[in-house]
Curated annotation (Swiss-Prot):
Class of this enzyme: hydrolase
Cited InterPro entries: dITP/XTP_pyrophosphatase, ITPase-like_fam, RdgB/HAM1
Coiled-coil regions, chain positions: none
Protein name per its UniProtKB record: dITP/XTP pyrophosphatase
Source superkingdom: Bacteria
Cysteine-cysteine disulfides: none
Subunit text: Homodimer.
EC numbers for this chain: 3.6.1.66
Gene Ontology terms: biological process: nucleotide metabolic process; purine nucleoside triphosphate catabolic process
GO-annotated cellular components: cytosol
Annotated organism of origin: Bdellovibrio bacteriovorus (strain ATCC 15356 / DSM 50701 / NCIMB 9529 / HD100)
Length: 199
């Protein structure tokens, strides 16, 4: 079985490959494997909108296979839900992970009584080889640390402390994240449904 993942994000792709490593019959590809692929702008208003845009764009050139589009981001209560769907571009269109993290911490400290409660949200839109659409959601609750810590993961992992933990995701490592992350939860829901149609 082929699964094509609509992402150009190397960190995200590596995470998917890690999460799917125990499925020997599954071959994972991404839009990066298509030389002429041009992604569409992510101009949706929700995570689901953007996940659908990604999946549909890839499916236009790779039909009759499984295609997965995903949008994920960090939702911070004290910032009225920001960075949200703008998580990857929070500090600007070409911002690095560290620039996005710096802006996040700055925006939180500007609040008179910072609310650091947050959650990672992931929505995946999957197209079956016959074109049926499936939608899955996952989330991970936690708080924002006062400064970055840890060397694992990507994005906001160095400042996100999962509920019940004292270390950031970047400190806890890939083993923890692959079991309990927002992405792992959404992917688990997809794989459970896949078992019902492809046992």
């Amino acid at each position: 079985m082929e699964l094509w993942i609509a992402t150009g994000n190397k960190g995200k792709l590596a995470e998917y490959k890690q999460l799917l490593r125990e499925l020997p019959d599954l071959k994972v590809f991404s839009q990066g494997d298509i030389a002429s692929f041009t992604p569409r702008p992510e101009d949706g208003k929700t995570f689901e909108d953007n996940a659908r845009i990604k999946a549909k764009t890839l499916r236009a050139v790779k039909n009759n296979v499984w295609v997965l589009g995903e949008d994920a981001g960090l939702v911070v209560e004290g910032l009225n839900g920001l960075p949200g769907i703008h998580s990857a571009r929070y500090a600007g269109p070409k911002a690095s992970d560290s620039e996005n993290v710096s802006k996040l911490l700055k925006m939180i400290t500007l609040r008179p009584m910072p609310n650091k409660n947050a959650k990672f949200v992931c929505t995946t839109v999957v197209y079956t080889p016959t074109g049926e659409e499936w939608v899955f959601n996952g989330e991970m609750k936690g708080t924002i640390a006062s400064k970055p810590a840890g060397l694992h993961g990507f994005g906001y992992d160095p400042v996100f402390i999962p509920e019940g933990q004292t270390q950031t995701l970047a400190e806890l490592g890939t083993g923890y994240k692959s079991l309990l992350s927002h992405r792992a939860m959404a992917l688990k829901a997809f794989l459970e449904k896949l078992q019902t149609v492809n046992p």
